[in-house]
Amino acid sequence: MSADTRAVNRQMTAFDDRDTVWLFGYGSLLFKAGFDYLECRPARIHGWTRRFWQGSHDHRGTPQAPGRVLTLVQQDDAICEGMAYLIAPRVFDQLDVREKNGYLRLAKTLQFDDGSAADGLVYIATPDNAAWLGEAPLADIAAQVAASTGPSGPNRDYVIHLAEALRALGYADSHVFGIERHLHALERAG
């Protein structure tokens, strides 16, 4: 699959008949939404976990030196905590550009803190996209992150801001926090 998924996502029509749609955010949407929303509240999806396995040559890296950004990967016992944003479908025009580098809009069930649930959409980069980097040791991911900068800024800022946002929400994520620890160690070693 091409790294540019805008055309594929425009064909996602499952929610076209709705005035509003829930969007699940688990990465940069936690610290930099950058779009209009009607409501925002904590949510989670089951069976998925965060991983820095997606390459970024359009935001946090370049084609010659891609950064690493989050995607979700399936894991049966996992729960990914994040934020649900209630948006108007027109917002997807903006989001499809932001998430064009290999991310597909997929329908998932979102669980809320009050026990209720709703169908919604989440952007997930799958292994068949051209920007996929895949699994690597946390220290190697941190080294790549530390060396990468793109139009949206240093890749390290993405990791640090995400870790801060997760802590502010009371969420723990060993993958994100492990990469953050390796980044700080690299900075101390200087």
Give the ranges of each region predicted by the language model:
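A glycine-rich, hydrophobic/aromatic-adjacent loop/helix-cap motif
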Residues: 1-190
